[in-house]
Amino acid sequence: MDPDAVAKAFVEHYYSTFDANRPGLVSLYQEGSMLTFEGQKIQGSQNIVAKLTGLPFQQCKHNITTVDCQPSGPAGGMLVFVSGNLQLAGEQHALKFSQMFHLISNQGNYYVFNDIFRLNYA
């Protein structure tokens, strides 16, 4: 499958799940996965989802601006870099964000091995 198509499909699935059913993200991570969220490192699928479901907002909408990807390693991994806007319910202004995913191929499916998220305040 075309890497750009895989990246686009992953990004659409990830953010639609985040916006509508954050606990559902658990299947995208494994116990060896790591999230760096605003500088805080969290390891393991359960811990990552606990962090994401514990954020101080319940409703949000991600609007994706760009998706870039590159193949990573001989085993079919992929780097995916995303930028966009995060609109929180009840807030007038959206927050700009960047997020990088390192996806690892596992029997025809992908899981998130590394995930780095930052809000962009500039």
Curated annotation (Swiss-Prot):
Record function comment: Facilitates protein transport into the nucleus. Interacts with various nucleoporins and with Ran-GDP. Could be part of a multicomponent system of cytosolic factors that assemble at the pore complex during nuclear import.
SUPFAM superfamilies: NTF2-like
Tissues where this protein is expressed: Expressed in roots, stems, leaves and flowers, and, at low levels, in siliques.
Superkingdom: Eukaryota
One Gene Ontology MF term: small GTPase binding
Subcellular localization(s) per the UniProt record: Cytoplasm; Nucleus; Nucleus envelope
Keyword tags: Acetylation, Cytoplasm, Nucleus
Protein name listed in UniProt: Nuclear transport factor 2A
Chain's gene name: NTF2A
Transferase listed as a keyword: no
InterPro entries in UniProt: NTF2, NTF2-like_dom_sf, NTF2_dom, Nuclear_transport_factor_2_euk
GO BP annotation list: protein import into nucleus
GO cellular component, one term: cytoplasm
Annotated organism of origin: Arabidopsis thaliana (Mouse-ear cress)
Subunit structure: Interacts with RAN1.
Classification via Pfam families: NTF2 (PF02136)
N-acetylmethionine PTM positions: 1
Keyword check for Cytoplasm: yes
Domain (NTF2) ranges: 6-119
Species classification: Eukaryota, Viridiplantae, Streptophyta, Embryophyta, Tracheophyta
